[in-house]
């Protein structure tokens, strides 16, 4: 742990800026573990990096008044994204002065100042829903992240309010009860969306349409066949080919129906044989039982 009040050197600030440019803001532990920056930042902790980067961003964005921060705190609390603006080139002495004068101001107030104050609490709650779903998607754990992992992700990416843990517990319970999340062994996963009902309806209607088409197939009598043959004598080659294709299709339908009827008849015959065998066995058993009873009575 580095000393909080120890002044930052230009080399440390340069290493911090380079680390943020390489890994992004919020990845403080990753920056400290990076061999390119670990030597220069060996006296600093992840909290030191976060505070210093916040002060650099605040100064670059024009926020430096304690009074503005206190007024922003009175307007309300909500989960807000962390500031990610690139810091401007400023004098090192000014940075140290800003660190000494603004370090005790809560970071939520800094980020809250530029946000609209008339937003309703319902919108804040809805935004917390989005943050929870975002955390689950980004963490990509097979069995789902725990509540602690979700909270750590949101705290690492955003500035949560003081009662964040209570709000998170309430919101997770509500999402589970509404069916949006699935909770198994204290871990949370996004519930799979149900398949569109249109696909099932399409398959059913398609099957019904094929069945109706088969039922409507023409069944020609002998006289109709003779009439069709007479009609074919005056046809061209194209008309005759189309007529023949139609006849083949109707024949295939008839063959399929005949095969289905044969299968049904065979199944019925097998059922009848099984029923007859069962009846014969019962009859034989009854006869043997009656014979045994008569023998006992005779004795």
Curated annotation (Swiss-Prot):
The keyword Zinc-finger does not apply. Residues 28-57 bind DNA. This is Single myb histone 1. The keyword Nucleus applies. Transmembrane segments: none annotated. HTH myb-type domain confers double-stranded telomeric DNA-binding while the H15 domain is involved in non-specific DNA-protein interaction and multimerization. GO terms for molecular function: double-stranded telomeric DNA binding; protein homodimerization activity; single-stranded telomeric DNA binding. GO terms for cellular component: chromatin; chromosome, telomeric region; nucleolus; nucleosome; nucleus. Forms a homodimer and heterodimers. Binds preferentially double-stranded telomeric repeats 5'-TTTAGGG-3', but can also bind to the single G-rich and C-rich telomeric strand. InterPro entries: Histone_H1/H5_H15, Homeodomain-like_sf, Myb_dom, SANT/Myb, SMH1-6, WH-like_DNA-bd_sf, WH_DNA-bd_sf. Residues 238-279 form a coiled coil. Its main location: nucleus. GO terms for biological process: nucleosome assembly. Residues 1-61 form the HTH myb-type domain. It is found in: Nucleus; Chromosome; Nucleus, Nucleolus; Chromosome, Telomere. Expressed in leaves. It comes from the Eukaryota.
């Amino acid at each position: 742990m580095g000393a909080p009040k120890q002044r930052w050197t230009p080399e440390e600030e340069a290493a911090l800026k380079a680390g943020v440019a390489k890994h992004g803001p919020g990845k403080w532990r990753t920056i400290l573990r990076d061999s390119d920056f670990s030597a220069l930042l060996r006296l600093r902790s992840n909290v030191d990096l976060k505070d210093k980067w916040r002060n650099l961003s605040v100064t670059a964005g024009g926020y430096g008044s304690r009074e503005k921060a206190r007024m922003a705190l009175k307007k309300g609390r909500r989960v807000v994204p962390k500031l990610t603006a690139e810091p401007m080139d400023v004098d090192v002495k000014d940075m140290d002065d800003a660190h000494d004068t603004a370090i005790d101001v809560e970071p939520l107030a800094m980020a809250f100042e530029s946000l609209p104050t008339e937003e309703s609490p319902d919108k804040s709650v809805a935004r917390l829903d989005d943050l929870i779903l975002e955390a689950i998607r980004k963490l990509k754990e097979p069995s789902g992240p725990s509540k602690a992992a979700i909270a750590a992700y949101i705290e690492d990416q955003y500035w949560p309010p003081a009662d964040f843990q209570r709000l998170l517990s309430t919101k997770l319970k509500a999402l589970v009860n509404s069916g949006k999340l699935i909770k198994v062994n204290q871990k949370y996963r996004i519930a799979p969306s149900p398949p569109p009902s249109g696909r099932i309806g399409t398959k059913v209607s398609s099957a019904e349409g094929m069945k109706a088409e088969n039922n409507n197939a023409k069944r020609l009598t002998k006289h109709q066949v003779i009439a069709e043959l007479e009609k074919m004598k005056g046809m061209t080659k194209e008309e005759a080919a189309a007529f023949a294709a139609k006849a083949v299709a109707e024949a295939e339908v008839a063959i399929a129906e005949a095969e289905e009827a044969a299968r049904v008849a065979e199944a019925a015959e097998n059922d009848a044989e099984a029923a007859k065998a069962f009846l014969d066995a019962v009859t034989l058993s009854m006869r043997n039982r009656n014979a045994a009873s008569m023998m006992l009575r005779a004795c």
